[in-house]
Amino acid sequence: MALGLKCFRMVHPTFRNYLAASIRPVSEVTLKTVHERQHGHRQYMAYSAVPVRHFATKKAKAKGKGQSQTRVNINAALVEDIINLEEVNEEMKSVIEALKDNFNKTLNIRTSPGSLDKIAVVTADGKLALNQISQISMKSPQLILVNMASFPECTAAAIKAIRESGMNLNPEVEGTLIRVPIPQVTREHREMLVKLAKQNTNKAKDSLRKVRTNSMNKLKKSKDTVSEDTIRLIEKQISQMADDTVAELDRHLAVKTKELLG
């Protein structure tokens, strides 16, 4: 207790007054910067309010068993010279948006011309979207036409890309015109789309892991100039952001699965 009071007195008066006036649960951690030079290390001290124990009900205890209930909320501006957390957050959000876009454009019960637009076709100039090298139109509710007259040399590659798109399509070719019959909506077709949705979600999680790994690697580059406690706190923030993003990806998958299965 005496040691605690001594440490409390050592805190800058501004922070001490703030702490005395603002008693909050220890779970609400705010990063405050105190610029000190100790052995060449910058110290980013994390000050939390006086700990208050919250007595949970049995139900709440059971729900939280085995899970860490402490969350951090670092002010990105205070650590921007170490890592740009706002940029990391935007990269994680882009993973979610890419999955949502994929779901909306390629995973629909009824195949539409728009579903074929972004199919990647391997050409001599690299991968191009199908709508960049063709004209796609709906001839009837049961048939989509893909006109390859502008890039006839890419016809075979376009057929291959459509067939391997995972949308259960079997294109037929007549010269430079590709006919794409729209499959009937069967239970098997619905389940196939759900399987594809899960695969795309797993790919999104792979992309998210890359964002997290790259962020952690950037953070480690500062270990010689920033305290270990600060590094660990920022690592926890990044992991927390990644976990929240995974939960969001799973939520979108659940919604899409329900939509596809009817």
Curated annotation (Swiss-Prot):
Locations listed in the record: Mitochondrion
Gene3D superfamilies recorded: 3.30.1360.40, Ribosome-recycling factor (1.10.132.20)
Keywords: Mitochondrion, Protein biosynthesis, Transit peptide
Transit peptide start-stop: 1-55
Positions of disulphide bridges: none
Pfam family, one: RRF
Main localisation: mitochondrion
Keyword Electron transport: no
GO MF term (any one): ribosomal large subunit binding
GO-annotated cellular components: mitochondrial matrix; mitochondrion
InterPro entries linked: Ribosome_recyc_fac (IPR002661), Ribosome_recyc_fac_dom (IPR023584), RRF_sf (IPR036191)
GO BP annotation list: ribosome disassembly; translation
Coiled-coil residue windows: none
PANTHER family: RIBOSOME RECYCLING FACTOR, RIBOSOME-RECYCLING FACTOR, MITOCHONDRIAL
Protein purpose: Responsible for the disassembly of ribosomes from messenger RNA at the termination of mitochondrial protein biosynthesis. Acts in collaboration with GFM2. Promotes mitochondrial ribosome recycling by dissolution of intersubunit contacts.
UniProt family annotation: Belongs to the RRF family.
Stated name of the protein: Ribosome-recycling factor, mitochondrial
Organism, scientific name: Homo sapiens (Human)
Source organism phylogeny: Eukaryota, Metazoa, Chordata, Craniata, Vertebrata
